[in-house]
Amino acid sequence: MKVTDVRLRKIQTDGRMKALVSITLDEAFVIHDLRVIEGNSGLFVAMPSKRTPDGEFRDIAHPINSDMRQEIQDAVMKVYDETDEVIPDKNATSDNEESDEA
């Protein structure tokens, strides 16, 4: 399985979220709501998640092996590094941000 497209929107918020991302796998399957997060060890890609009633975040979709996780990370960060435009986003909040996983 390969990442065949990355759509990324850098955003300016008060929180640690730096971009919202959608990826396409094998030109056949799209995953929305990935995020680029500024963690204590630098930027990382967070998978789409939802907050559970006890306040924890649980991934909705995620890779099941380290090779696929690295491919997603590399593809997203390549586009992130190539994207200059930062959009102020009034709708993006730190409410859906995870704790540092990196």
UniProtKB/Swiss-Prot annotation:
Residues 83-102 are annotated as: Disordered. Transmembrane segments: none annotated. Keywords: Cell cycle, Cell division, Septation. GO terms for biological process: division septum assembly; sporulation resulting in formation of a cellular spore. It comes from the Bacteria. Could be involved in septation. This is Putative septation protein SpoVG.
